[in-house]
Swiss-Prot record:
Cross-referenced HAMAP family: 16SrRNA_methyltr_I (MF_01877)
Protein name, per record: Ribosomal RNA small subunit methyltransferase I
Catalytic reaction(s) noted: cytidine(1402) in 16S rRNA + S-adenosyl-L-methionine = 2'-O-methylcytidine(1402) in 16S rRNA + S-adenosyl-L-homocysteine + H(+)
Subcellular location: Cytoplasm
InterPro entries: 4pyrrol_Mease, 4pyrrol_Methylase_sf, 4pyrrole_Mease_sub1, 4pyrrole_Mease_sub2, rRNA_ssu_MeTfrase_I, SAM_MeTrfase_RsmI_CS
Listed SUPFAM superfamilies: Tetrapyrrole methylase
Amino acid sequence: MKTLKVVATPIGNIQEISERAKKALQDCEVLFCEDSRVTRKMLDLLNIDCKQKKFVINNSFKEKQNLTFAEEFITNFKCCLVSDAGYPSLSDPGNEMINWIISKNKEIRIEVINGPSALMCGLITSGFKTTPLLFLGFLSHKQNQLKNYLSTYQNQKSTIVFFEAVHRLENTLETVKNVFKNNDVFIGRELTKLHESHYWFNTSENTLPDITLKGEFVIVIDNQNINHQTLSSNQYLVYEIKKLMDIGVKLKDACNYLAKKMHLKSSMLYTLFHESI
């Protein structure tokens, strides 16, 4: 059976490539990719000779003639599908190719070779619950559409993950604050790269964290406690303290943890908790 190998590639750290992925890339004759320059650079870092390989740009797989063209390659050559970074098909035009092949040619086998994922890396680093999970990919560039789109998930109990570009980050985070009133948010910048950095804040806070506006971002919203979104800022803080104490964390430690996480004074949280009793 003919096989299309779908290969996840590093999202920043080349050392995260697996031996299985390297072998697939080395053995293949045709590479379907987003940008041949990016893929060639990756192969060069992996010491894989690409002189005899054919590179096919997959940005326009929505056109049927290109999909038919891809099918012919897969039938006659060893083929791999890659993204510029991470998993092909996740916010990537390769999804059209995989979907079309599955629906049109049952004789072609889809084989996924696992690897790095910005989605999973951001989700795990956030510390938020991992299920239910809602992945939104890249959001609309238009502010009104963005707000309306996020509002449709306001009452959906889940952890929400999406990607954002640096030039839209601040506007998007302000929109998140407008839609989600008392939610913890994680921002992962340049995940797995040399200057990787993490930020947490709550949407009830007046200001955004001091974020280095360079690189690529993963945004994670904790929307698991939707019944508490209407709480005031102080009520929310008390609720968070109690939530930690319910799992055995001492009051002092809970206040210290939240103070560090939310850039507040632990003494203020301690006083706030006692005033609520």
